Design a protein with these regions (language model features):
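Mixed-charge, low-complexity intrinsically disordered regions
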Residues: 1-99, 104-119, 125-165
Length: 165
């Protein structure tokens, strides 16, 4: 898989589950901070299929394709899952396919007498939401740093694997 297919790869430590209010049965709103980049992530997970736990760590991968060596078909087709050997899904426990629907500006944060302008990316996985926050803005593109190749309405895959607790 070419490196440009891997949009984001990080370890997430879950800090809260359903912190505000439980709205839907069989859905958990999981919130946490990534270990290396210290980004804030909030995501909805189907808890019937893949329950997550506070204090546990999970490997997250956002990818443009589930295939190691070729691009995923642009439109959902039967062929997408008819030959699923040697895919990224082989190494993960939970996979969702969704669309980027929003880039937004976060509230300004104070850091050492200066304000930091941060951004968020929101992705919808069939109504289950995923948001990465506290991203720094790229001065050239105006998009979040490290996510310059992401566009609105782009299809992305979220792959998750539990790695501790």
């Amino acid at each position: 898989m070419s490196s440009n297919n891997r949009v984001f790869e990080e370890t997430l430590d879950i800090k809260y589950i359903d912190k505000d209010l439980k709205v839907f049965d069989k859905v958990q709103r999981c919130e946490g901070v990534t270990q290396d980049t210290k980004l804030y992530i909030s995501m909805d997970i189907n808890s019937d299929i893949y329950p997550m736990k506070v204090g546990a760590s999970y490997k997250l991968l956002l990818a443009k394709s589930i295939y190691e060596s070729k691009q995923t078909p642009k439109y959902f087709e039967y062929e997408l899952f008819s030959n699923t050997k040697n895919t990224l899904m082989d190494n993960f426990d939970y996979v969702m396919c969704g669309k980027v629907f929003q880039f937004s500006q976060d509230k300004k944060e104070k850091n050492d007498n200066s304000e930091i302008d941060t951004l968020s990316i929101s992705i919808s996985f069939g109504g289950l939401l995923f948001q990465i926050s506290k991203l720094k803005r790229d001065d050239k593109t105006g998009k979040p740093k490290g996510f310059e190749d992401i566009n609105l309405d782009e299809t992305l895959y979220l792959l998750i694997k539990k790695i501790s607790k």
